[in-house]
Amino acid sequence: RQRQMCIRDRGNALQNDLTVSGGNENSNYFFSLGHLDQDGVIKNATYERTNARLNYEAKLNDKITLSSKMSYTYTNSNRIQQSSNVSGLMLGLLRTPPDFDGRDYKGTYYSSSGVEYINRGRSYRKSIGQSSNQSYTNPLWTVNEQESSTRVNRVTVTPQITIKPTSWLQLITRGNLDFADDKRTYFFPVGDASSRANGQYQEDVFDIRNSALDVIGKANFLLSDDVNLTTTVGWSY
């Protein structure tokens, strides 16, 4: 019964996409917008992604072409503790007998002296919430009370200029900017198992900035009717 309340038979995913493209003999463009909404086989395990992309190319003349690729991605996910730890889903689930009804996974406990303890976690080994440490966290507590979320915003921009001074020589200069902020939140309420019995809140923020520059030269030589030589040299920073 607890397994059925924690784990679905199958996950669900909904993907929506929109694309627009066009152009003429001197320019072209491509735009796409997409959204993915996904629920995992474990309840409250979610993943959401929204992404947009714009590609553009313009031919200024017979020798110079400009292009740019830009993209934005936002992801928001919540992951359930699954690995081999007493706060995770599987240990509490597999070490709970099937005849134990753990649906009331939290409640109010009264000590022998009448002291009231609200929102106490209730598990097989602490069936009336007599301790702030559940020993093995009730799996329903794991999927409903804990949080392990990640939110990421990412932007990439890749401009490029291509120059063909002659019919056999091509020069490419390409840049890349990659910006991302990654915020991860972990929350274990008071009453969890192990060292987190007193509760734990943790927030990690990563600010990522990457840039690159490539300069590439391509040359094509016709040595004879049967032999063709193509050479490529480049520099990256």
Task: Identify the residue ranges that each predicted region occupies.
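Alpha-helical support elements that line or immediately flank enzyme active sites
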Residues: 157-163, 177
